[in-house]
Amino acid sequence: MGILNVTPDSFSDGGKYNNIDAALLHTKEMIEDGAHIIDIGGESTRPGYTMISDEEEIERVCPVIEKIKNEFDIPVSVDTYKSRVASAAITSGADLINDIWGLKYDDDMAAVISGSGLPCCIMHNRNNTDYSDFIKDLNKEMLESVNIALNAGIDRDKIIIDPGVGFGKEYIHNILCLRHLDEFCKLGYPVLLGTSRKSVIGLTLDLPKDERVEGTLVTTVIAVMNRCMFVRVHDVKQNYRTIKMTEGIYGRNSN
């Protein structure tokens, strides 16, 4: 899953692709580099981000969705936690909704997705880091999101889960997410891992965000070895080659 941030303020690439021509060029590059899905974000979710209105997010995202769907044959995911944005994105041609609040922020989100018949990715997130038993608590809270989806009528086979590295977690929690990826795969849903250039890598290696590719690639190997189905990344070419080499040695879904 290649990341396309059409924002002026995303933590890693804010301002690079927030016009349609630049977004289309980057999409073309990511497809050529091996991306199977393009994930479009119209609002930065970096630590300390400023929330924007539904209307502004729709204006950023929907024209890009329409252009990509007109010019390329690739599924488009939209990274939003707002039901109005999701509805507009679906109308514009989105193929998947990626909700960083696991359907818990907007009470209408699950119904919008259910009505569309599209798949969704539901990420673990919370407003504090006060865990009593981290992995147990995380699994419980992810399954709460899954139940919201199921109760809204979203098909079980259209649900993807994401442990939410970097969201509602301290450094050690992010490390534990990576150390125990197999626990999330045991829940019975496809798992997406998003670690690309994140602070857990920067803190481990003491490197700025533009020097975290190698650290990201290590987490991608871990994802493949633990049967994750998706990795959400900025550096598509390097990650695609890493996945291909890992699968060449161990086979696809080797565990």
Predicted regions and their residues:
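Phosphate/pyrophosphate-binding loops at sites that engage ATP/ADP/AMP, CoA/4′-phosphopantetheine
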Residues: 31-35, 145-158
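Catalytic domains of carbohydrate-active enzymes, especially glycoside hydrolases
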Residues: 25-41
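Active-site-adjacent loop and "lid" segments of alpha/beta metabolic enzymes
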Residues: 11-26, 45-63, 67, 72-75, ...
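Conserved Motif II region of HX4D acyltransferases
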Residues: 164
